[in-house]
Amino acid sequence: MPRSTPVASEQVDFVMKLLGNTTKQITTATYIKLAWAVVISCNTGSNDTVFGITVNGRGAPIDGAGEMTGATIATIPQHGCILRVWSLPRMPAGMISRERVQRLLQHLELVLQDLMADPSCKVGDLPRMSRQEWDQIQRWSGTLPPVSRQCVHEIVNQRSLQFPNACAVSAPDGDLSYAELIRSANAVAAELLVHGVERGNYIPVLFEKCKWSPVAMLGVLKAGAAFVLLDSSYPPQRLHTICGGLKTQIILCSKDMYARAASLGPTAIAIHENAAFLADIPDVTFPVVSPENAAYVVFTSGSTGTPKGAVIDHQSYCSGALAHNRAHVLGRNSRVLQYASYAFDVSIMETLSTLMAGGCVCILSDLERHDHFANSVQRLAVTHAFLTPSTARLLMQRELPSLCVLVLGGEAMSLADRSYWMSRVRLMNEYGIAECSVASTIREVSHVEQKDIGFPMGVVAWVVDQNDHEKLVAIGATGELLLEGPSPPVGRSSSNRAGSGRCAMGSQAGSYKTGDLVRYNEDGSLSFISRKDSQIKIRGQRFELEEVEQHLRRIDEIQEATTVVAAPSDRPKQPYLVAFIVPRARESFCVCSARALIPHPTEEFRLQAATIQTKLHSILPAHMVPAIYLPVNRMPKTSSDKIDRCRLKEEVGKWSWSDLRAYSVSSMSHRAPSNRVEQDLQRVWEQILGILLDSVGVEDSFFHLGGDSIIAMQVVAEARSRGLDHSVQDINQLKTIKAIANKIGDVQRAAIKLVQNHAMLRARYVRQKDGAWKQFFTGYTEQCFRFSVHQVKSAQEMRQIIGESQTSLNPEHGPVFTVDLFHHGGEQSLLMIGHHLVLDLVSWRIILADMEAMILDPQHQPHLTMSFQTWAHLQAEYGTRHLEPPPGQQPCSIDEPSMRQFWGAENNANTGGDSKTRLIRMNDDLTRKLFGPSSQALDVEPVELLHAAILFSFVNTFPQRPALVIFGEAHGRETWDSSVDVTRTIGWFTTLWPVVAQVNPSDSLETVARTVRQARRAMDMHGWTHFTSVYHNTRQTKRSAGAHLMEITFNYAGKFQQVEQDGSLFRMEPMAKQNLFDGAAELGRWAMLEINSVILNGLLEFHVPYNRGTDEARVLTPWMDNLVKCLEGLASGFA
């Protein structure tokens, strides 16, 4: 302990009223010393005190000391032993307030008065605090909060009557209004009653995160029973232990959990959309439920090795919920995140308390909780969240405009946590235990130094002597927190219940000893100090060390075992659960270190540790399985013959993390990455775990390297940002980089390779000072494109993700290319989205071909041709030197005002957001005839045939109007030099040119087809020469910048052979067809109407975007109807 010199900052003068000395054998000084020892003992919790006293020094055994001149005063330690327990209290300098000094002196005066009035009194009967302190504590804790006499489901019923159509539950599998929630819950309750459920029964509930879990909870309550939430991630043995203790007869479950639930009890009832009992509710009478009846049971860790259950009744929960809802500012407009695992009571508060307030429960799927946490919170517009500080850190640096209230608990907030969140939300620090209705104290954090757990809510809090719960401790002294409320937990062991001692305030109340040590602050708030016993909490999850040890000792390979929570020397803020093991097989020790407490590791012990860990994982929840296993020759003991946990903890603190890892099975072989994905994953693990790159082998277990569930979420988020998409479940199950890299799969590897090969998929654009735009390429980095994997259950969910991916494109900052892989119903869908600035339809053919080849053969190296930038530079140079811009303006059929008037869009903007799209799809027979006999008979290409049909139908629909000048679109990859090869180059090469075909309404279709053929073929290089001379000529560029609005553009995309051929890896999804020609809402359109045609799955389709102001009935519909008739006539006339 570092030396420190106390410095007095102020002085308190206090005059005491003392009684006359009643006996000559005891001096006043002795009384004062004894009284001061008692006061120190009461205020520090120590039964053995040491303090300094000042003496005159004349009593020293020195001749003539009494007649000496000069200062002889001295300060000596005074030992006042009250009991035999030794404890040296330590208090940092500057931590004693003036008010506390005043209380100490008042207490000293009271103790002195009692001592001097009755010198024969027992020390234990002396007052433990001053009268002023007693009065203050009574003011803080003297009144019990109001007790609710309602049941949980009754309050939710009231909300359904008030807001029947309001959203009660928003979940991955759908939403429920309050009316739908109550109707479904009534159906579940009726089904339970039909199966013989009675009041007082316990009903386990086994669901994944879905909308049916709140229905099941309310259904059980309405049937008069109590629910028990089961966590589906728990090992089967633990679930069997819980259900066996409840004597389970009926289990409610989801459809997916039915097989597992059926193994836990005689009868499993699955709740799902098509369950018959939801549609046909039998006529049954629901039982009358008393507020004293049990509402739910929550199981926590037990020191005997068996989980122990706390039973919470309706009265207790409702009283607590009404109090914490007020503190949380929860109401009907609240959208509360349901994040916690069903194994923890916070999940009950997130669900039931929200419904009692009339809010919406926003349920995240397990995939969203672990892999898409921040995005899901944002998407659901969550207003309230209850998280641990570690989990909340995953939301930092994210825009969460809807989040209003953030309640943190389960572990201490750091200064950084308080600093970050205080300015963004109403930040609250909360404390609670499962046995007392989830939440017991709360503090709204108003400045960064606030560390306390706040004030009681819904309960009365007392700080009592940890050895005698009937004695209060002084303000500022450490004691055990005792909570007093409507009733104690009715199903818990009586060992934690407190009787109506001096601190109890009424016979109707029940008190519960929490086992947590706290102290009062000056304002009556409470500060958490530590646990009284061996129950511990790691990353917000509380459990008993004894339970872990019980299971360890039952393993055959272990002779003796104990556990501690300790942090390595190089990770002081990362505590781990460490198991110390005395193995039965002595060969697990290194002979040369037999005398050391912790011997050197051996291969035998590493294998043994792996076996032990596997066995524990099959029995215990993951957070209760030790991360580190260390062999010991013998367990160190204290003088009282108990295991010396302090020494074991100190031993761990001497070792670095890499030293401790030497005892794990992963140290047996350290293998380097063998491919790019493994290398990238290794870098992610190094960064998040905070260890050297060389320390991470591809076959090392994530958990042996120090990972946990929260760190796994950080790893997944960082890996995704680098294009390596996997899930927390993958880490939990696969554990190693090698296995995860294999799981990431061929699709992601192919996508990474695609972006590495084609620079345009890494293009960015910057606007320069003169307003011109400049294109550049980024090098390949993890952020240069986005790859995501999604588990979806509906087309609606997929559409939402598609929309998010589309809006994520950003040509300035990236990405310009995204890949989403969807898993749904045993199938996979691949969504690729590229910005039109960097690719065209020919580019998509290249992308599909490359992706298919690289998925089928990871070693495939696609042939690359000239880069887009090189081509663009050469084209501009050629255009400037050799091409003359055409004279005058671009040809058009009519002027723009007349054009707008004709279409009925005089006053409308012409952007993507101001457009609508009409889809025309021809059948397969007509498509086949058009591109076979019809084209051959007229001696035209398919694009010329379609162009002719469009023009012919227009002039016949509007004979009084001048014929259209249709601007044709082409792929633009014609080259002026044979050395220029862009056949496999990704980029936007599209050209546009006016096709001037002079036709009349009296012309036949054959005549129009020949005219169109002639006009299109007369344009050099499919319009490339014209387009380049206008737009890629440095002498013409500025003059062309304000080019006029085109009336009609026509593009024939042809046939996507990669998705048409038998055996092709890809096939086009119907959803993708609808988005094939999609554009941004704010993007200006260059034509009044665009006709895009393509053949998909053997069917000719026209996608026709047009201005929203278009007079459809007068103009568009008659023309499109005539176009279809024209195509039908072509197919039948030339078949």
From Swiss-Prot:
Compositionally skewed regions (Low complexity) per UniProt: 491-502
Q: Which GO terms describe its molecular function?
A: ligase activity; phosphopantetheine binding
Can the keyword Coiled coil be found in this entry's annotation? no
Q: What is its EC number?
A: 6.3.2.-
Does the record bear Membrane in its keywords? no
Residues recorded as bearing O-(pantetheine 4'-phosphoryl)serine in the entry: 709
User: Which parts of the sequence are annotated with region: Condensation 2?
Assistant: 746-999
- Give the InterPro entries listed for this entry: ACP-like_sf (IPR036736), AMP-bd_C_sf (IPR045851), AMP-binding_CS (IPR020845), AMP-dep_synth/lig_dom (IPR000873), ANL_N_sf (IPR042099), CAT-like_dom_sf (IPR023213), Condensatn (IPR001242), PP-bd_ACP (IPR009081)
Keywords in UniProt for this one? Ligase, Phosphopantetheine, Phosphoprotein, Repeat, Virulence
Q: Name one GO cellular component term.
A: cytoplasm
Reading the lineage from the top rank, the first entry is Eukaryota
Residue segments, region Condensation 1: 23-77
Gene Ontology process terms (BP)? amino acid activation for nonribosomal peptide biosynthetic process; nonribosomal peptide biosynthetic process; secondary metabolic process; secondary metabolite biosynthetic process
Gene3D superfamilies reported in the protein's UniProt record = 3.30.300.30, ACP-like, Chloramphenicol acetyltransferase-like domain, N-terminal domain of ligase-like, Nonribosomal peptide synthetase, condensation domain
Record domain Carrier: where: 672-748
Note down the stretches annotated as region Adenylation: 177-562
Residue ranges for the region (Disordered) are 485-507
What the protein does comes down to:
Nonribosomal peptide synthesis (NRPS) is a key mechanism responsible for the biosynthesis of bioactive metabolites which are potentially contributing to organismal virulence.
Q: What family is reported?
A: Belongs to the NRP synthetase family.
Q: What is known of its domains?
A: NRP synthetases are composed of discrete domains (adenylation (A), thiolation (T) or peptidyl carrier protein (PCP) and condensation (C) domains) which when grouped together are referred to as a single module. Each module is responsible for the recognition (via the A domain) and incorporation of a single amino acid into the growing peptide product. Thus, an NRP synthetase is generally composed of one or more modules and can terminate in a thioesterase domain (TE) that releases the newly synthesized peptide from the enzyme.
What is the recorded name of this protein?
Answer: Nonribosomal peptide synthetase 9
Protein encoded by which gene: NRPS9
